Amino acid sequence: IGSKYDSANIESGTSKLTPYSTVTDKIKSASCTYKTIGDIVIVSATVKMNAVSLAGNSMCPLIDLPYKCISEDNVFCVGISNLGKLFKFAIPKNNTWLQFSTQDKTAYTFADGEQINVICLYKIK
């Protein structure tokens, strides 16, 4: 475990994010890297999609973030795909889920292998 911390006591690591059972056919893979700095974690996630459509009001939940979000409110971040589409990401309070939908709430069809990147910060202590 000592190799996960640097001299400033900042923990770094990687984590595989698991698509929730209702969206396993939509997501090819999902993972993240993270750093903890005091009571905050910075998560940089990458989601690779299959060639599927997402309805305008649909959410794609991923589970297994490295730390539970203990913020008083849900945390929101914006992600972008390699094709330029924007996505709204949310981490519900008291949870280890990262979920996303299209930012403009319109339906969207992903290209096979389209990649979404997002960086979120949230409170863990």
Each predicted region: which residue ranges?
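Short, exposed beta-strand/loop patches in secreted or surface proteins that constitute
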Residues: 31-36, 87-93
